[in-house]
Amino acid sequence: MKNFLPLLIIGLLFFGCISPSTPSIPLHLTNASLPATNSSQIQTINTTTTSIPVNSSNSSGISNVSSTNNNTSPTSQNTSAPVLIQLIIPASIESNCIGFLVGDSTELQNIPIAGGAWARPHPGPFAWGFIEKTPGIYDFSETDAWVISAQQSNVALLATIWPFADWDQTCKQNCEVDSSDQFYPKTKGGFTGGIPAKRCAPCNMTAYEHFIATLVERYDGDGVNDLPGLKLPINYYEILNEPAMDDKTLTFFKGTNMDYLELLKSSYEAIKSTCANCKIVQGGAAGIDFKFLSFWETFYSSGGSQYVDIANIHYIGNGDRDTLNVKKFKQTINNYGVNKPIWVTEAQYSSKDSITSSFEGSLDAGASRVFFVSFKIGEMNPPVFGEYSLEYQSLAAKCK
């Protein structure tokens, strides 16, 4: 009997009646595209046990959303919860209040040299019809190139969304701008620049909302369907530019202020549903002339502020130079109970005389970020790498 007990235990183990304890298994990252990050970019770690369908995509940036199989569960065979790391814009960039308009991604490398940390591509690559040329198929190759170039220069992007696709603009007439428009689309070397020619509000708002949610998801840095290698997310989106501008050679939007409010509402809700911490910037007010301010008075008196995180004013050499139009614009929106952060996303100077005083005046009046139109004050020529006005270098120290 003394020799029988060990044999009995061995037999039970062999037939599976008793199983040794299983060591705990550590959590693993399950999204193959999740990039390496450093501690300055980690904000939160979220865990989930639900499966996440992943759109089919490849390194070329082309994604066919219709090929997603929602019945396939990438994590269904794994009982451990995946860890998703949320990328954020580092504090060193967030605290910098200097940005520049750039027309080409090669200009991004000039921004840190000049003392800035932000870029507003203009008109930029974030146009619905240029990304989704065919309904349901997205080509992110151009936007990917911008994002990669920006993070290589350690520059954060303010992306301007152009909610226009020619194939969608079928429900209204007279949507196409004049061919003399400064941003009429032109194709060169296989690349189309400018802005889609038809510029009414989307006809199929559901399709537009799907586009913008897909775009935001690719660059939000949450580890789900992100651009492979993403390190610096896009957290700020401007919906259109100067929607009140209506000129033969410069029209950004064919619609009323109420049309813009509805468009902004749809954009805001689609972005927030995908990226709750993303911020929506109002399309820039073109100045403080009566026709521009009246557009925004109606917009804000009709409840537009609930779909805006950041208000936006421009100074293009006209108006109040001392505050870059911030003082008057702030007073105007305050009249309707609106108290939002204010950015100046276009500041243009003809000379160097007042750049420091007016920049400080804009901050004192309530601006929290200023984007300059050119690297060399008074010049609008394409910039040369390393060339900029020295006056810019001292401005970053004045950020509040």
Range-by-range predicted roles:
Residues M1-A36:
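Secretory targeting signatures
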Residues S33, T37-T79:
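Extracellular mucin-like PTS domains
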Residues P341, A347-C399:
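Substrate-binding cleft of secreted/luminal carbohydrate-active enzymes
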